[in-house]
Design a protein with these regions (language model features):
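Surface-exposed patches in mature extracellular/periplasmic domains of secreted proteins
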Residues: 56-59, 86, 162-163
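General structural signal for secondary-structure boundaries
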Residues: 12, 86-89
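Cell wall/extracellular polymer interaction/catalysis modules
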Residues: 2-81
């Protein structure tokens, strides 16, 4: 049997994290206003603002074998949460502690929004490079500034819809807005020849 990690590990400092504003995008849909929609294929989280607009946040999703879909509600919010890796996660990686206190080194980051009575959360991260990838064990990672912003905008009881992909028409509208902007073309000026 592999060697076990320590029972308690420090998560490090807890600096003040400023809110990072998300991008407002066109989001014509029938999803409930005020609700959260998570598109696992697109690796995006949307906070629906109106029947036609949403705030868009890039996220990290569950890696293969750890992704899921369904409906939940936010049951709790915690700033700089402690992390208690589940036994099966500790079995896969015996170096993990039984508990890591909240802090900048903690994988849950600056804030966690707990989803129902499940072990899943929308949370910050200690690894910003994981955003946009399938890298978690089923949770949804955000940049710390983004999760702080989202937490300030939602309440306990907010509905969360996790979908594999958005409906095709909506997916196209959103994709057209997230494509990188075209590089500006240099202006061409004609030079007159000296006479």
């Amino acid at each position: 049997r592999p060697r076990r990690g320590s029972s308690l590990q420090s998560g490090g400092d807890r600096p003040t994290i400023d809110r990072l504003e998300p991008r407002t995008v066109s989001f014509p849909s029938s999803y409930p206003v005020g609700g959260i929609v998570i598109d696992t294929k697109g690796r995006q989280l949307f906070l629906v603002q109106s029947p036609t607009e949403a705030l868009r946040y890039p996220i990290s999703v569950g890696r293969e074998g750890f992704s899921w879909t369904g409906a939940e509600t936010i049951s709790r919010k915690a700033e700089w949460p402690d992390w208690h890796p589940p036994e099966e996660m500790r079995w896969r990686d015996p170096r993990l502690p039984e508990k890591m206190t909240g802090g900048i080194k903690n994988p849950l980051g600056a804030m966690a929004l707990y989803l129902g009575s499940s072990l899943y959360r929308i949370h910050g991260t200690n690894d910003a490079t994981s955003i946009g990838r399938a890298a978690s064990s089923g949770c949804f990672r955000m940049l710390n500034g983004h999760v702080v912003d989202l937490a300030a905008r939602v309440d306990i009881g907010t509905g969360v819809q996790v979908v594999h992909r958005l409906p095709p028409e909506l997916e196209k509208v959103v994709a057209d807005q997230v494509a990188p902007p075209e590089a500006p073309k240099p202006a061409v000026t004609k030079r007159s020849r000296p006479s």
